[in-house]
Amino acid sequence: MCNPTVIVAHPGRQHSFRVAKALKEGGLLFRYVTTVYNKDDSLLMRFVKLFLNKDSFQRASKRKCPGLDDNDVIQFCELEGILLLALQRIDFTRILSNKVQRYVTNKFQRKLANYVIRNPQIEAVISYDTNSSVLFSILKDKVPHVKLIMDNAHPNRHYLYHSYHENWGCVGDFSKTL
């Protein structure tokens, strides 16, 4: 890849900031795509911050990556993302917020898929675990040349257990400290 053609996408935040920042430092980031991001020129975020308490204001202010310029960030479903964050703070049963999260995540993935389809210079998309299924199924059919990379913050324990035991002998004396 000689031009920056990788998209990092997550409708929340997770550790996607770090991946996007590292790709930008390596000259590979095309765009970081998310829902809620504290852009300097975001009127919606400014308005929302007017009504937040101190703790929530600080949390909202952290939705920005110091290593990324605002031009590096694209937002889809910003209003829905903000409403979801508010709902998650008050819906302790998670019944309604889980349904809204599924809706926002699926809508985000469809919008992102359309964006990738319209930008043929994109060579790879990095997405995260449960936020990938709709996106990947659309892209697999419409733009099969795009590499689809799923980052999973919570790897399968069963797989890790077997992998650990298969490779136990390869690490020598270090294995005794585990």
Segments predicted by a language model, with ranges:
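Short N-terminal targeting/anchoring amphipathic segment
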Residues: 6-10, 74-75, 113-132, 139-141, ...
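Short, polar loop motifs at secondary-structure junctions
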Residues: 36-38, 130-133
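A conserved catalytic-core segment of Leloir-type glycosyltransferases
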Residues: 2, 37-107
